[in-house]
């Protein structure tokens, strides 16, 4: 009987550890986008193909952009949040992963102006064209710096 009680108590101690493991896994990216935007849908597919879980809310993104602290000069096609960070427009999945690994004190990342060749803007309709662009790290105090350059 004592052995069964020990096993029962040990299993109770394991519950929080199992729950913690269940909460880990691929990061969840919450996306706010227009229901009619094809490039936004392609960006979501890019994130999923790179291991992210994605939850999409189809609505105008400007309200969330403001709530997340993204300046209008960085605003573009869609807005997202992953963990404590805001993501604006066609940011590559690899840069989001780097952001989550490095954990800088920042609002998040942005790729203004929907550059051709960025994820979601790289479909066959663009004929392989790739414009140079920068992924910007948005500072909490305002301003930005280049997080990653694509040339």
List PLM regions with ranges.
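N-terminal secretory signal peptides and thylakoid transit peptides that target proteins
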Residues: 1-16
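Boundary at the C-terminal end of the N-terminal hydrophobic targeting segment
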Residues: 19-22
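Local sequence-structure signature of Cys/Sec-based thiol-disulfide redox active-site neighborhoods
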Residues: 27-41
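Solvent-exposed loop/turn segments at secondary-structure junctions
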Residues: 36-38, 61-63, 86-87, 115-117
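Typically the conserved alpha-helix immediately C-terminal to a functionally engaged Cys/Sec
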Residues: 43-46
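Conserved dinucleotide-binding and phosphotransfer motif residues
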Residues: 50
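Thiol-based oxidoreductase modules, predominantly thioredoxin-like and allied folds used
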Residues: 54-65, 74, 82
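Thiol/selenol-based redox catalytic cores and closely related redox-interacting motifs
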Residues: 73-151
């Amino acid at each position: 009987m004592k052995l069964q009680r020990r096993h029962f108590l040990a299993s109770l101690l394991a519950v929080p550890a199992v729950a913690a493991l269940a909460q880990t896994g691929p990061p969840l990216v919450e996306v706010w986008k227009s229901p009619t935007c094809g490039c936004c849908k392609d960006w979501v597919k890019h994130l999923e193909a790179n291991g992210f879980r994605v939850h999409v809310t189809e609505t105008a993104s400007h309200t969330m952009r403001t709530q997340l602290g993204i300046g209008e000069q960085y605003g573009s096609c869609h807005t997202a949040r992953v963990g404590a960070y805001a993501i604006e427009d066609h940011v590559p999945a690899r840069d989001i992963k780097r952001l989550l690994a490095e954990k800088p004190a920042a609002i998040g990342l942005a790729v203004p102006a929907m550059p051709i060749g960025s994820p979601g803007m790289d479909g066959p309709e663009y004929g392989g064209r790739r414009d140079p662009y920068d992924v910007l790290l948005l500072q909490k105090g305002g301003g930005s710096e280049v997080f990653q350059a694509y040339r």
